[in-house]
Amino acid sequence: KGELYLELHRATLTSQQEMKRGCRREENLLRTTEYLCAAASVFNPEYRYPREELDGIWKTLLLNQFHDILPGSAIAWVHRQARADYVRDIARLRDIAAEAGASIASARDDADMRSNAAIVPYTAKNGDSWIARTAAVGTQDDDANGTDAVADESTIATTCDDGRIILDNGLLRAIIAPDGTVRSLIDLDNGHELVPDGSGIGHYELLRDEPYEWDAWDIQRDAFLSAEGIDDSHVERVTETKRGGATVHVSSTTDGVSIDACITLRPKSKSLEFRTKVDWRASERFLKVDIPMAIQADRAQYECQYGMVERPIQKNTRSDEAKYESCTHRF
């Protein structure tokens, strides 16, 4: 019962993140699309389930899950081809899902078809969910990630004399240092500080990718002992999103690596969002970002395909110490 953890080939859990991301997004979208297509087949007699097309997309996805594509240990042109497959098939699945949704709406007079909505995880103190708040939420803003709900309030961005930037939306307060790291993140509902003393969220580190054997397959524990921080990092500017949010733009550079990060706090949101673009021209290196959290817990859960695995946070045994790398799909 549980995970069979092999103390080998740990790099395949995180190598080529774009392969993991594309695979998980397409898996999730396939499930949603098949559900909508099945529902359309039930509600609209004229709708024809696109079985052959979905089967073809499934076969391509399963091919890209094969060794060495999904593990990230293939050569470059293989990943380019897989990336193109993900982009093409995800776009097509969205079209199929939209067609199925429109078919359901046309067959049911009571169907309320919305094209400008998004699911916002939210539960009020009285137990009301996002469904009860749909009318109040209104349209969505897609300027950053498509899930910014309309709100009367705005995020207040304040630049201090010492270069620090404070983002405050009444629910969260983030203090961002001139180097772009988040030095404080406070939940204003309970006053809890989420960043440990003396640390910061969003500090990038380069590690040596020189395993004893099998490049792109393994990561040695020694690599973490030689981590080099990217110290040439600074805040470039602060901008406002379309719906009253605030974004801090951070630039980080070192030999062969350029990182552009956007840190966004939106109105009525309890999430501080990071969106990062990396121009990678380095070799025999890999990149990590440090996200320390002041949370008391013994274990952490990480999503994998169709489930999750747990990892010990405290390294009390040799077995715990060996689990220093983990698959992390969406959380």
Locations of the language-model features?
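Catalytic and substrate-binding regions of extracellular carbohydrate-active enzymes
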Residues: 10, 16, 27, 51-55, ...
